[in-house]
Structure formats: C-alpha cells, structure tokens
C-alpha cells in the first residue's frame, strides 16, 4: 500500500483500484480472515477483507439495493427470507424495508465482520435490532443443507469471491440444497462478480450449476459498483417458476421507503442482457 492510499490490484487482469485514505481505524485477524477499516478522504469509511474492497460508504447502496429489491419485487409475496453471508448487514437493512417480510435470517460464518460493521458502519446495521431479523453465525452451506424444504421465499447469497470457504456457495450441490429450501415461485439471488472480468470464470459456470440444480430460469442482473473491480458488477437470479422480468411493478413504484438507485426502470434495465453475456 502506497502511503496515503489503499490499492486493490487484480493481478491477472492488470488492473487496480485506489482510494486516498486518511487513516486505518481498525485492523484484526479473525478466525477466518483479515479485517480492516479505513477512513478515506472522499468515500467515507472503507471495509476490506483479506485485502479486497467489500464496501465504501459512498457507493454501498448500489450493491445492497440491487442484491435485495429486484428479487423481492419479483416474488409475488416474499415473507420468509434468508441471507447467506451478508455480514456487513447492508442487505438485511434493505430486505427489512419491505413491510411484508415477516422474518429474515442472516447466516454469516464470521461474527467479527458483523461486530466490526456495527461499530464502524452503523448506517448499515439499522435493521439488526428489528424484531423480524435473526442473526446466526454458522456455516451457510450446512445451514442450507439442513433447512426445512419449501420453508423460504427468497434466498440471497452475499458471499465473497468464489475462493476459500465461499467456493462451495457456487456449486451445483449448494444450489440444489437452496432450491429444496425454496417454496413454489421461490427466488435466489447470488452475487456473481464482474461481467467484464469474470464472465467465463464465474457467471457462465454459475448459470450451468443453477440449471443443473433444476432452476426453471436463470437470469443475470448487472449494475454499477465503482469501488469493485472494473466498476461493473452482477448478480445471478435463479427462479423456481416465474420470470423476474414480470415483477410487481406497481408495488415497486409505490414502495413505502426510499431508495437511491433501484426503481422499476432500473429493475427492467438491469435484466437486459448485454451482447457479451448472450
């Protein structure tokens, strides 16, 4: 790290992203990963796990809104939601903006990520004390495998990159377990890296795994996240019946909460397929 800057380099792609920083305000080695928090000059606080940018306060809303609202508005009546990963709690915040959601279970392997977020990113953790929220710190792979069949409406997989402990979240076996836990019309959304950098290494294999797991439809959402490699990110939507392009449009336009990025037009546009992903 050059003095005064934090840099995340993607060596294989010959690209790097840097943020000017004022100071590192927290550092620890948890049981699972190296956790750092920086105060940047213009992007608010920065959360870094094992050297990789997880979020900045300036652009976190882009990722968290798009990982939550398209799936929730695509489901006809989302009441039971599970988040696998999501330790920073930003997706939990967005999910519980929906008044119809009755219960959301967040299953995060590393409790320290959540506790660090509660201390240094309180705006992400505003739903942690919601009576509809349940935080559980355990292995998401095992939890999904043991989940009651047809007990969930929406599953959101907010994992780190598909290496190490997170690699199992991108497999046919895991997605088969997720599909079993979903009720009719159930939806899973999973972060799937950059369309520009990871089309062949992540997105295409995840689509194949989802199809092999028996999902009726597999779709890619694309959206900007400037602090992530390439600045262009994706999530993969997998459905047990239905089509996320046929969403509750009126509800999304009259939602009883404010968003900074997501709306009905963005929902439609994010599901449009660029030529390079066809």
UniProtKB/Swiss-Prot annotation:
Key words, A-Z: Cytoplasm, Polyamine biosynthesis, Spermidine biosynthesis, Transferase
Gene3D superfamilies listed in its UniProt record: Spermidine synthase, tetramerisation domain, Vaccinia Virus protein VP39
E.C. numbers: 2.5.1.16
Pathway assignment: Amine and polyamine biosynthesis; spermidine biosynthesis; spermidine from putrescine: step 1/1
Top-level enzyme category: transferase
Residues that, per the record, bind spermidine: 64, 88, 158-161
Residue ranges constituting the PABS domain according to the UniProt record: 3-240
Reaction(s) catalysed by this chain's protein: S-adenosyl 3-(methylsulfanyl)propylamine + putrescine = S-methyl-5'-thioadenosine + spermidine + H(+)
InterPro entries: PABS, PABS_CS, SAM-dependent_MTases_sf, Spermi_synthase, Spermidine_synt_N, Spermidine_synt_N_sf
Pfam families, per database record: Spermine_synt_N, Spermine_synth
Keyword Cytoplasm among UniProt keywords: yes
PANTHER family recorded: SPERMIDINE SYNTHASE, SPERMIDINE/SPERMINE SYNTHASE
Name this polypeptide is given: Polyamine aminopropyltransferase
Organism: Halorhodospira halophila (strain DSM 244 / SL1) (Ectothiorhodospira halophila (strain DSM 244 / SL1))
């Amino acid at each position: 790290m050059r003095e005064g800057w934090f840099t995340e380099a993607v060596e294989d792609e010959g690209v790097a992203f840097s943020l000017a920083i004022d100071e590192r305000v927290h550092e620890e080695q948890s049981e699972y990963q190296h956790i750092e928090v920086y105060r940047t000059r213009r992007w608010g606080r920065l959360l870094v796990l094992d050297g990789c940018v997880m979020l900045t306060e300036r652009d976190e809303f882009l990722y968290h809104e798009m990982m939550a609202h398209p799936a929730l508005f695509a489901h006809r009546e989302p009441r039971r939601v599970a988040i696998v990963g999501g330790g920073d709690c930003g997706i939990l915040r967005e999910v519980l903006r929906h008044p119809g959601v009755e219960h959301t279970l967040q299953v995060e392997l590393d409790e320290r990520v959540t506790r660090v977020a509660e201390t240094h990113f309180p705006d992400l953790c505003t739903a942690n004390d919601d009576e509809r929220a349940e935080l559980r710190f355990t292995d998401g792979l095992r939890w999904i495998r043991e989940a009651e069949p047809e007990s969930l409406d929406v599953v959101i997989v907010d994992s780190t990159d598909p290496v190490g402990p997170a690699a199992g979240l991108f497999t046919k076996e895991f997605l088969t377990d997720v599909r079993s836990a979903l009720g009719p019309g159930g939806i899973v959304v999973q972060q799937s890296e950059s369309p520009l950098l990871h089309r062949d290494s992540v997105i295409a294999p995840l689509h194949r795994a989802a199809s092999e797991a028996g999902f009726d439809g597999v779709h890619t959402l694309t959206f900007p996240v400037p602090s992530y490699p390439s600045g262009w990110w994706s999530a993969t939507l997998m459905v047990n019946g239905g089509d996320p392009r046929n969403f509750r449009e009126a509800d999304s336009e009259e939602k009883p909460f404010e968003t900074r990025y997501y709306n009905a037009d963005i929902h439609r546009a994010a599901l449009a397929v660029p030529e390079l992903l066809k």
